[in-house]
C-alpha cells in the first residue's frame, strides 16, 4: 500500500491515545488523552495564547490549565474535547490529511450505540475521511496475539473488561466491566506512600507516583507470604529518586498496590477481582467453548504490565476452574499496545478492504450504517 492511502489506526484510551499507520508494528504517536484550557484568560497574553492544549503540551503546561479527560472508563463523555484530540492526532502527531485516508477507530466493549454513531458522524462530517471502521478493543488484542478465540482481560487506565471472543466475534452477554484500572491503582499507591510519610498531592506529583508504579510495582504470587517477607527483611525494598533529588524507599507498597486488582476491597470497592471476573465471564458462555477460553486467556493493556501478574492469574484461575481444566495465560510482551497492533494488522489485511464503511455508504445511509458494518 502506498503511504498516501495507508489506513490510519487510532486507539483512544481513557489515559493514552495511540495512533499510527496500518502495517507498522507499533504506534507512531502515544500521548495523554487530555485537553487543557487556561484557568484565567488574562495570564496567557503573549504566549500565542490558544484556547486549548492537547496531550503532552497540555501536560507540560498543566500548572496554568484546567485538565479534562474526555474519555471516562473507556467511553467518550465529551465530544467537543474528543474532536480536539482527533484533530491533534491527525494534524499535529501524524501530520496527515484525514480526508485522504481510511481510519480505523477502536471502541470499548459495550460502547453505547449512540456513541458509535457519533464517532462515525464526526469522522465523515468533520474530518471527511475516505472510509472508516470501528473495532472493539479487546477483539483487536486477541488478533494481535494471533488468535480468533479466547478471553481477553483488557485493563488500561480508566476501565477493565473481560471479553470472551469466539471465532472473531465478542460475546456481548458474557462481557463484564470492572471500574478498577490504572488510575485507581495510582491513587491507591499515593495513599500507601502517604502512610509512609511521603506526600504527593498535586496533579503533577500524581505523574511521579504513576512512574513509581510503572517502574517498581509487581504482583505477589502469594500475598500473605510476601507481606511476611516484607515485614521481616529489607530484601523487597527499592529506592526511587524524585525529580528534586530526594531518594525515597518503597517496600511492601510495591506489591500492595497491584494487589487491589485481585482484592478490590483494598480500595473500598465491593466488586470481584480480575480472576473472579474472568471466571464469571467464562461461566456466562456456552459449556462447549469454555475449554477454549480457559486455554486462551490473553492479557492486554497497560495495567496488565506488572511482573508476576500472569503467574498469579494462573494460580487464582486454576483455584476457581474445574480441576481437570487446562489453563493458559498469554501475556505478550507488547501488550501495552496490543489493541493498536491488532488494529494495524486488521486494517492491512486484503480481506478487510471490503469491510470499510465508505463515504458513499455513509451519505446514503447515515450514521446508523455503523451497526450494520461493524460488529
Swiss-Prot record:
Localization of this protein: Cytoplasm, Cytoskeleton
Known EC number: 3.6.4.-
Superkingdom classification of source: Eukaryota
Keywords: ATP-binding, Cytoplasm, Cytoskeleton, Hydrolase, Nucleotide-binding
The reaction(s) this protein catalyses: ATP + H2O = ADP + phosphate + H(+)
Enzyme class name: hydrolase
GO terms of molecular function: ATP binding; hydrolase activity
InterPro entries per record: Actin, Actin/actin-like_CS, Actin_CS, ATPase_NBD
GO CC aspect terms: cytoplasm; cytoskeleton
Family (UniProt): Belongs to the actin family.
Biological function: Actins are highly conserved proteins that are involved in various types of cell motility and are ubiquitously expressed in all eukaryotic cells.
Protein's name according to its UniProt entry: Actin-1
The organism of origin for this protein: Echinococcus granulosus (Hydatid tapeworm)
Organism ancestry: Eukaryota, Metazoa, Spiralia, Lophotrochozoa, Platyhelminthes
Amino acid at each position: 500500500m502506498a503511504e498516501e492511502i495507508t489506513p490510519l489506526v487510532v486507539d483512544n484510551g481513557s489515559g493514552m491515545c495511540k495512533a499510527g499507520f496500518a502495517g507498522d508494528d507499533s504506534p507512531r504517536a502515544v500521548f495523554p488523552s487530555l485537553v487543557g484550557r487556561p484557568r484565567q484568560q488574562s495570564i496567557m497574553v503573549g504566549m500565542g495564547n490558544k484556547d486549548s492544549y492537547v496531550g503532552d503540551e497540555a501536560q507540560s503546561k498543566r500548572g496554568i490549565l484546567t485538565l479534562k479527560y474526555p474519555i471516562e472508563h473507556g467511553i467518550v463523555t465529551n465530544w467537543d474535547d474528543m474532536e480536539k484530540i482527533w484533530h491533534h492526532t491527525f494534524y499535529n502527531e501524524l501530520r496527515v490529511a484525514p480526508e485522504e485516508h481510511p481510519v480505523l477507530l477502536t471502541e470499548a466493549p459495550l460502547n453505547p450505540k449512540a456513541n458509535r454513531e457519533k464517532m462515525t458522524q464526526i469522522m465523515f462530517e468533520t474530518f471527511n475521511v475516505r472510509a472508516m471502521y470501528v473495532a472493539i478493543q479487546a477483539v483487536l488484542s486477541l488478533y494481535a496475539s494471533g488468535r480468533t478465540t479466547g478471553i481477553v482481560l483488557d485493563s488500561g487506565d480508566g476501565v477493565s473488561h473481560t471479553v470472551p471472543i469466539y471465532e472473531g466475534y465478542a460475546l456481548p452477554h458474557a462481557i463484564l466491566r470492572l471500574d478498577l484500572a490504572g488510575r485507581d491503582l495510582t491513587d491507591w499507591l499515593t495513599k500507601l506512600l502517604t502512610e509512609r510519610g511521603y506526600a504527593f498531592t498535586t496533579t503533577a506529583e500524581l505523574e511521579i507516583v504513576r512512574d513509581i508504579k510503572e517502574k517498581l510495582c509487581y504482583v505477589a504470587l502469594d500475598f500473605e507470604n510476601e507481606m511476611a517477607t516484607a515485614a521481616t527483611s529489607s530484601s523487597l525494598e527499592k529506592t526511587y529518586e524524585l525529580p528534586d533529588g530526594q531518594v525515597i524507599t518503597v517496600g511492601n507498597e510495591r506489591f500492595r498496590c497491584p494487589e487491589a486488582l485481585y482484592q478490590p476491597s483494598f480500595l473500598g470497592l465491593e466488586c470481584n477481582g480480575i480472576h473472579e471476573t474472568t471466571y464469571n465471564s467464562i461461566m456466562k458462555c456456552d459449556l462447549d467453548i469454555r475449554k477454549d477460553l480457559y486455554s486462551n486467556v490473553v492479557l492486554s493493556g497497560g495495567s496488565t504490565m506488572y511482573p508476576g501478574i500472569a503467574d498469579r492469574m494462573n494460580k487464582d484461575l486454576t483455584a476457581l476452574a474445574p480441576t481437570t481444566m487446562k489453563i493458559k495465560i498469554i501475556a505478550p510482551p507488547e501488550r501495552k499496545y496490543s489493541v493498536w497492533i491488532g488494529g494495524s494488522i486488521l486494517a492491512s489485511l486484503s480481506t478487510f478492504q471490503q469491510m470499510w464503511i465508505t463515504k458513499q455508504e455513509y451519505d446514503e445511509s447515515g450514521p446508523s450504517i455503523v451497526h450494520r458494518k461493524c460488529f
